[in-house]
């Protein structure tokens, strides 16, 4: 069988959405996600979640993860360009992603640490200032 052992780079699943958690580069993370999606996994072992079973479940996961990566990137850019502080941007992301299962198993301190790296990466890679 085609089993993919994922890392947080491919998203942290909260039961409804795959939150992007990227520490090295947002563009690089998006490329990794697209490559992993193209593998046609039948099972994915997700950090902080467990196993997703079935080709269709895996396809849906990657579809959702790609959507959430794009949503996060676009909103961080928009919020930054409108003058919102990094702290406030991180709080908006917390409200969207640190809920449900993720809120129960993913320590808040880790979420703040990781998004505290990711938000400036997005701004650096996509914003002119």
Feature map (PLM): residue ranges:
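C-terminal regulatory/interaction regions
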Residues: 78-129
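Catalytic core of the metallo-beta-lactamase
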Residues: 1-31, 35-38
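Broad hydrophobic/π-residue packing in well-ordered secondary structure
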Residues: 5, 29, 45, 68, ...
């Amino acid at each position: 069988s085609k089993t993919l052992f994922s890392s947080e780079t491919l998203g942290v699943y909260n039961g409804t959405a795959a939150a992007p958690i990227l520490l090295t580069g947002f563009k690089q993370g998006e490329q990794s996600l697209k490559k992993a999606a193209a593998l046609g996994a039948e099972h994915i072992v997700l950090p902080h979640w467990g196993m997703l079973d079935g080709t269709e479940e895996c396809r849906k996961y990657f579809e959702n993860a790609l959507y959430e990566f794009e949503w996060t990137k676009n909103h961080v850019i928009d919020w930054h360009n409108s003058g919102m502080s990094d702290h406030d941007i991180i709080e908006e992301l917390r409200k969207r992603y640190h809920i449900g299962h993720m809120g129960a198993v993913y320590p808040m301190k880790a979420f703040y640490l990781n998004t505290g790296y990711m938000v400036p990466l997005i701004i650096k890679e996509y914003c002119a200032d």
